[in-house]
């Protein structure tokens, strides 16, 4: 999944107050210089959360992995993965954890 503008982000929309844990990993390409990175995010409320931030100017971000788990005991949560380009939000997938 490519994020190619400074407005592109990946977000998670969670439906309930569950213990949602997210790991994202990516590589940035800035004029041929490749830089790996990652981010861990803990979500504990029903909210919209950016889990992969936008790349810098003149940089393309290639998201290599997005791992989402529900560590709650007994609380299910509907999770939507969305791409926001600064104007439009597109739902990429939705599932119940």
What name fits each language-model region?
Residues 1-97:
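Surface-exposed, low-hydrophobicity beta-strand/loop segments enriched in small/polar/acidic residues
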């Amino acid at each position: 999944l490519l994020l190619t503008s400074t407005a592109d982000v990946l977000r998670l929309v969670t439906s309930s107050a569950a213990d949602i844990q997210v790991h994202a990993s990516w590589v940035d390409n800035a004029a041929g210089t490749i830089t790996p990175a990652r981010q861990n995010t803990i979500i504990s409320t029903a909210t919209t959360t950016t889990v992969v931030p936008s790349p810098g100017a003149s940089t393309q971000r290639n998201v290599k992995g997005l791992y989402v788990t529900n560590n709650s005991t007994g609380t299910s949560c509907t999770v939507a993965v969305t791409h926001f380009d600064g104007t439009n939000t597109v739902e990429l997938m939705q599932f119940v954890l």
